Amino acid sequence: MIKSKKILSLIIAGVLGVSMLTGCSQNDGSNASNENKKTDSKKQKNIGISQLVEHPSLDKAKKGFIKALEDKGYKDGDNIKIDFQNAQNDMPTTQSIASKFVSDKKDLIYAISTPSAQAAYNATKDIPIIMTAVTDPVEAGLVKSLEKPGGNVSGTSDYLSIDKTLELVKTLTPKAKKIGVIYNTSEVNSKIQVDSLHDYAKKNNYEVVEKGISTSSEVNQAISSLVGKIDVLYVPTDNLIVSSMPIVSKVANENKIPIIASEEGSVSSGALACCGIDYEKLGYKAGELAIEVLEGKSVGDIPVTTLDETEIIINEDTLKALDMQKLSADNIKYIKSDENAKSAK
């Protein structure tokens, strides 16, 4: 009997031991699962940046985006990996870049300019896209509305009422009657701004003389063809024209044609003045929206953002070259031409 009790005790102890081992094994599995989840949440995110062309405004939009990420602890080479690609102002290349980002399975695409954003959107409806420097995202077919984008695109728009810019024509060139404009016929945002220019001109008794081009090799001929036909030149946020501003400003300034531009980069490249926004701030805001997406928010639920704050910027060197006087207003920022503009003169 005693022997039987001992055997029974050993059996019970064995069963309990196996149960404890099984429990430990299950706990270890659960802990491992939790650790895997933690690892997944800290997994390095891959971000593709597609920029149409290098010029000051788009470069600032890129800089602001990266700074916003860094300010929130997202460091390239650490918890994020940034793949930057520049299309060198070639539209087919924007498509190639977007397709490569999709095949690489990027976690997010940052598209700088309307063509870059359109290329990304055409390539994927799954990967979230944060755009910037897009004048009219709705007209470009990127979002359903600014308030409720839907789909996989949101970001920041550089839309600014053309009235603010063209009021500078009245202020700086009060005798002007003919406004010239050169623009890339392939850029949707440029067409929108030229249409707005025509609307403004009708309301304010100006005549518009336009010249549409499609490649940078046509810029010199286009601006030269307007000499003697216009009193002032308007430059929209057109990436082809803005990236060629040293050429445009050289011809215009030599022929005493004031240039009213749409952003500071053009003014630093020789244009007379602009009423524009800060593209680094625009890019920074886009970076903040990207962080929301990286942390789980649906990009289609994030409203498209614009900047309300503007400033008037005047190029002192160009002012002198055109034999014009400084304005007495306090809210004006005066700058000098950059080295590229000076070397083109």
Swiss-Prot record:
GO terms for cellular component: plasma membrane. Disruption phenotype: C.difficile isolates lacking CDR20291_0805 and CDR20291_0806 show reduced uptake of tyrosine. Production of the tyrosine catabolic end product p-cresol is decreased by sixfold, and the intermediate fermentation product (4-hydroxyphenyl)acetate is not detectable at all. A lipid is attached at C24 (S-diacylglycerol cysteine). Transmembrane segments: none annotated. A lipid is attached at C24 (N-palmitoyl cysteine). Residues 1-23 form the signal peptide. Keywords: Amino-acid transport, Cell membrane, Lipoprotein, Membrane, Palmitate, Signal, Transport. This is Tyrosine-binding protein. It comes from Clostridioides difficile (strain R20291).
